[in-house]
């Protein structure tokens, strides 16, 4: 995404998963009431694992500011599955938007690191890897729900 194409557009245009969008909308609503939210999330690249801390706070004139800082950066051998340059099939593989683990169980609640998902789902045996889409695992949903609940007190 290019900066010029997203500035001034609603954030919600870029969050496709309904549950994830709802959690962020709830946090933004609390921030607009004068609270601030802070939580950790993963934002991995093909050659690294990044643990970030996000702070959401009220800005000037009714705006909301999102700030992140890197808590930890671990380099690893590149994982092609995470590269935007790799051609993809039309199939979807769900990745948690907070912990970056992969849904490896078709609704069984089994979420694993990408390297483990590649092996257990035999992704390298596919003609083309699936597209990645974001959702939220049960563990992160519970943690984020608690974060939002704490904003209400």
Region annotations inferred by a language model:
Residues 1-83:
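Sensory/regulatory domains in signal-transduction proteins
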């Amino acid at each position: 995404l290019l900066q010029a194409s997203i500035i001034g557009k609603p954030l919600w245009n870029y969050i496709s998963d309904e549950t994830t969008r709802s959690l962020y909308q709830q946090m933004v609503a609390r921030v607009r009431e004068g609270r601030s939210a802070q939580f950790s999330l993963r934002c991995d690249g093909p050659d690294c694992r990044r643990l970030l801390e996000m702070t959401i706070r009220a800005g000037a004139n009714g705006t909301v500011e999102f700030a992140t800082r890197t808590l930890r950066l671990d380099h690893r051998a590149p994982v092609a599955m995470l590269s935007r340059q790799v051609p993809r099939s039309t199939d979807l593989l769900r990745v948690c938007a907070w912990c970056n683990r992969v849904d490896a169980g078709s609704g069984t609640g089994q979420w694993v690191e990408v390297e483990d998902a590649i092996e257990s789902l035999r992704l390298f045996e596919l003609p083309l890897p699936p597209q990645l889409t974001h959702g939220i695992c049960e563990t992160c949903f519970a943690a984020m729900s608690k974060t939002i609940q704490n904003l209400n007190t």
